Amino acid sequence: MIFAITFFMGITSTLAAVLEPMSYYQYTQFQAPLSWEDITGKGLKQALDSCQQSFQWQRWNCPSQDFVQKNSKPEENSPNREDVYVAAISMAAIVHTLTKDCANGVIAGCGCTENALNVPCAHEPTKALEQYEKHFGSGSGAIGHNRRVVGALLQRSLEQECRCKQPGAVQGECQEEECVAVLKPFEAIAQDLLQMYDDAIQLEGASSNLKIMWQNIPLDSLVFMQDSPNYCERDATGLWKGTRGRQCSKDGSGSLEERLSCQQLCRVCGYRVRSQHVRTERRCNCKLVWGFRLQCDVCVQLERQYSCY
């Protein structure tokens, strides 16, 4: 009997500790110092995934090697359109990641002074941008302008997120709301950057008055200097493979880029479209046997695929 009472009291105290808001000391135990390696790694992975999804049906399809090369080479003041896009989405992803991690209380020394695990914390991209500039620099020329464009976009991407602090007497009613500014999901910001990529302005390399030139370019326009290479052809260094052998799609229910992919990837580049049936196997008709073992059939399917040759 004594054991049962002791056991019950132990469970009660444990539940109380879980349900009770964390003290500031307990809260800080979850935090770690700012690691640029960690933040950059998470941000660049998010940027690459978004880039490859956005350009899946384009002649330049954001190959991993080229993406890494564009991020690792020394800054150039004569970037092409794709250089500019990769730099912009990479910066946006890194700052977005840093902003959210700060607000969520993951990083020591930034974010709310209160317990962010119990109290909603506003996103502050301005502070994250300051940290980014301290670490990576502010850049000059086209690079500097485009970084300011990304910073302005992140500032415009704040929206109000509210939760009910004091419920009303009637179900579903709220007497008092608590609202904080949070960044839009990264996917929405990536769509804005993709539109900026399409609308980017090409500048001449020489200008009689660079200061006046930069002052006249709005902070919602990315700029680039050089024409893009011919992505139909294979790059001599292997950064992109050209469009020969690339798969295209004739799926009428897909996006406009997907529906036009055979035209843009094959015919415009001087290739023909080859159609072939490909045999694929997949698991199907799965069911649990004896309540714990998964048993499946193997279904064979013929799929029609299109490619450039």
Swiss-Prot record:
Gene Ontology molecular functions = cytokine activity; frizzled binding
Species for this entry: Drosophila melanogaster (Fruit fly)
Q: What is this protein called?
A: Wnt inhibitor of Dorsal protein
Summarizing the function annotation, the protein's role is: Binds as a ligand to a family of frizzled seven-transmembrane receptors and acts through a cascade of genes on the nucleus.
Gene3D superfamilies for the chain? 3.30.2460.20
The record lists the lineage as:
Eukaryota, Metazoa, Ecdysozoa, Arthropoda, Hexapoda
Q: What is its main location?
A: secreted
Which GO terms of the cellular component aspect does the record hold? extracellular matrix; extracellular region; extracellular space
> What does the record list as GO biological process?
canonical Wnt signaling pathway; cell fate commitment; defense response to Gram-positive bacterium; germ cell migration; neuron differentiation; non-canonical Wnt signaling pathway; regulation of embryonic development; ventral furrow formation
